[in-house]
Amino acid sequence: MNQRIRRARNIDKVMTVIFYAIAVFFFVLLAAFAGKVIIGGFAGATPEMFAFARKGSIGNQLFNTIYLVFISLVVSAPIGIFAGIYLAMYAKQGFMTKFLRICIETLSSLPSIVVGRFGYLVFLVMMGLGKSLLAGALSVSILTLPLITTTTEDAIKGLPAGYTQASLGLGATKWQTIFHVLLPACVPRIMTGIILAAGRGFGEAAVLLYTTGSGSSLRWGNWDLSSPTCPLNIFRPAETLSIQIWNLQTNGQDRALANLASAVLMLLVLAFSIGANVWSRRLAKKTAGDEK
């Protein structure tokens, strides 16, 4: 008996060491990759590369990237959250619900180049939007919508049944229970889905090749929303950081600028993820009554 216990403890120690070694390996691998991209990107950078110029800089592309992801989340986040609520709270088990879930899973696994082609045919050819920020954002929202939907559904279903039962028992309606009890409790997990969706939007290139174009000529003193050089005009062509990296690498142009754009894009995703996580945790504490 003692020998079996000793053997089990030895196996436990060995497995613990193995798991720690795997964790350290992946941490070192991630740190090395991020360090290589960031250090290599800023090593050859010059102050002019950070300007908001038409060529030879990343300022306009950085703004276009943030603006496009913001527009895509404005479209996909509300629709995805409401779709997740419907699937978790209202959808009845049956053929249509199963078919809807299969469609969502299929949509989430579609190659981005296929979605880009679809966006080109629908938003550019059929709707006549032309290559623009709006067409790109709508196409990216197609990719991010399934992720937000499934995250919201899983978050609501993962809550204890007592949340719903207690709220309904106190006289709240189903709608009040969802918005005042369930959703606040799901904020961290829903934000995780939105963060992942935003991360995919930041890095998309194949979709945007068909839909946004490569224009980055902006006039920062021009706030006429109908002007093609107005930064806030959603109907203008817009080159994002990922498209800029692709153009520079494939055309063999300024490699230092491409490296800088890669480093800035990685830092942008990292900063957004950290900021959104901190904000969602603070919001979760406030809704739970831990903070005043």
Locate the predicted segments by residue:
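Transmembrane-helix boundary motif in ABC transporter permease subunits
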Residues: 72-104, 117, 276-285
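C-terminal transmembrane helix and the adjacent membrane-cytosol boundary/short C-terminal tail
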Residues: 91, 157, 195, 231, ...
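Transmembrane alpha-helical segments of polytopic membrane transport and secretion proteins
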Residues: 1-22, 278-292
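Transmembrane alpha-helices
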Residues: 174-212
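Generic hydrophobic transmembrane alpha-helix motif, especially the helices
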Residues: 105-143
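Periplasmic/extracellular loop-to-transmembrane helix junction in inner-membrane transport proteins
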Residues: 2-18, 36-74, 244-255
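Interhelical loop and adjacent transmembrane-helix boundary motif
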Residues: 49-56, 208-266
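Glycine/proline-centered hinge or cleavage motifs at structural transition points of membrane proteins
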Residues: 111, 170-171, 184
